[in-house]
Amino acid sequence: MRGLDYKWIEALDAVVAQGGFERAAEELYISQSAVSQRIKQLERFLAQPVLIREQPPKPTPVGKKLLGLYRRVRILEHELIPELMNDDTAKPIQLALATNADSLATWLLPALKEVMTLRQVELNLAIYGESRSIEKLKSGEVAGAISLESQPIAGCKADYLGRMDYVCVASPDFYQRYFAAGVNYQTLRKAPAVSYDQYDDLHNRFLHDHFNISRDSIINHNVGSSEAFVRLAVSGIAYCLIPKLQIEQELASGVLMDITPGFLLSYRIYWHHWQLESGVLKEISQAIVQYAQAHLPQ
């Protein structure tokens, strides 16, 4: 019986990564019909579909498992073959990691600086909410993920990184305009806030836990940039929850103020990665864990 042909999975990976058959064909330097034929051969071999044919195409649950396997093999292959052939001219290894925006805006890049400087690696740092990033590791789309989840998925490890502490801040002018009567249920419902996106529930959780306010009771902007949060708050457009680590200078100078002193939102974050790691991927995991544990509150 013929075994699994990795060219079939390569075609599946290209279709998903490029968002369609035409671009996948260009990526693989084959015809579009050849890409389609390889996908059909894979589905015939497995006796089930591996691709949801919509726009853009998406892998089925079985397709996700195959992509996870394929991408792991590619990483190991990329590291092993140059070593066996004593070839130091190989292309950089490509790695995708899932992170939340706040980690990227604060401590993650300094943690990765040495590895990115010394090793041949191209990183794709994909931003997802803390509760969604683990799904990308399950599907094989990324080789590691920062998550709120403490329990590892099958075949992976979860290392504790530290605590992210959030403070609710605004500019002094904004505070006088909206909170002259104090920060309470009534005033918070009239003041504009900002969240990262519709999946960001940190602000909602904070308001619900401390003021019993629901999301649909407030004025809320969605801005997909942690750095823009700071600018919006400093310019007096909105109030928001921001990692304390990100705005220590603004708090010290008085440009921003903690409008709910004594109320802090904290959560623990974890680095999820494959149990069997080697080479640059192992170095990345070690760098992330060591730096975070040294610089984040424990």
Swiss-Prot record:
The UniProt entry, under CDD domains, shows:
PBP2_IciA_ArgP
Q: Which domain of life is it from?
A: Bacteria
Q: Identify the residues that the record assigns to the HTH lysR-type domain, covering every copy.
A: 4-60
What does the protein in this record do?
Controls the transcription of genes involved in arginine and lysine metabolism.
**Per the database entry, where does the chain bind DNA?**
21-40
**Whose protein is this, by species?**
Vibrio vulnificus (strain CMCP6)
Q: How does this polypeptide assemble, per the annotation?
A: Homodimer.
Which keywords fit this entry according to its UniProt record?
DNA-binding, Transcription, Transcription regulation
NAD among keywords: no
Q: Pfam families of this UniProt entry?
A: HTH_1, LysR_substrate
Gene Ontology molecular functions: DNA binding; DNA-binding transcription factor activity
Name under which the protein is recorded: HTH-type transcriptional regulator ArgP
What InterPro entries does its record include? Answer: ArgP, ArgP_gammaproteobact, LTTR, LysR_subst-bd, Tscrpt_reg_HTH_LysR, WH-like_DNA-bd_sf, WH_DNA-bd_sf
The similarity comment for this entry is:
Belongs to the LysR transcriptional regulatory family.
